[in-house]
Amino acid sequence: MNVLSICNLSKSFGEQKIIKNLNLSVPEGSVFGFIGQNGAGKTTTMKMVLGLLQPDEGEIRVCNEPVRFGQTKTNQYIGYLPDVPEFYNYMTAIQYLTLCGEIVGLSKKIISQKGQRLLSLVGLDGVEKRIGCYSRGMKQRLGIAQALLADPKLLICDEPTSALDPVGRKEILDILYKIRGTTTVLFSTHILSDVERICDHVALLNDGYIAVGGTLSEIKALHSHDSLLIEFSSEADLQQFKASMAKQPLLIGSEEKGREMIIHSREMKKAQHTIFSTLAEADLAPVKVALMEPSLESLFLEVIK
């Protein structure tokens, strides 16, 4: 069963078409990474899922119920964490969760039980200081606790790790990974390492439509390519090798960093023969040669070219 289904969705702002015939399915129980560059339309899509923005065309269903602009019926299934969550800074975490619980009609007993459990989940149990004194990472964790208060079927997180330091990012990702068995998670990001760490499904938004989608393993198997890292003793050697390899049809791209070059090819075995022959003919001896596994980053860079 799909918790979220999007069919032929389109949205324009003036003459600029942001979303173009977008199709997306989020399976129940998945941790779904929604990838795209800044400005690709990820937040616009999420706002339409929440009924906060009206699509020009297409249909959105949450738990098989249609989403209607301006109505909140389907939001009973959704927990939402915006990219910059806002709070009442004079409150403590438990006071804020109590207020949110009362708004959705939970009893005091349930609020107390859930509040303590969720604060423990996000590592804020025992924190008595006011929210205004929280770090950005602590506020993100409190935002997740609030979004989970009503036991949503779908948790939507908009760039939850984008402004955090490495420790804060790890804390958020650990929380999202922990809840994967009870809640479907959809989170948008442009940090590809976060997706590779916890996601089992991925969709790459580019130019308003889904360019690549599926399970992470399927995408890597079908769409990515092998890469070979070659390190030279000098940049002059690298440039000499680069000039010799410039017209090779087996190569689909390369990247340079200092004295290193990463070469991409869909036929790496054949490419390796060409590479080593070129090295021998040019009398070049690299200090390091290593075969690299396909990565989501290399696929992303290939798609957005």
Specify the residue positions occupied by each region the protein language model found.
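Short, Lys/Arg-enriched, disordered terminal segments
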Residues: M1-L4, K305
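ABC transporter nucleotide-binding domains
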Residues: V3-L4, K11-N206, A211-V212
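Short, surface-exposed acidic/glycine-rich loop or hinge patches that mediate macromolecular interfaces
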Residues: V67-R68, D125, I210, E235, ...
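ABC transporter nucleotide-binding domain
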Residues: D174-R266
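C-terminal coupling/interaction segments
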Residues: E267-K305
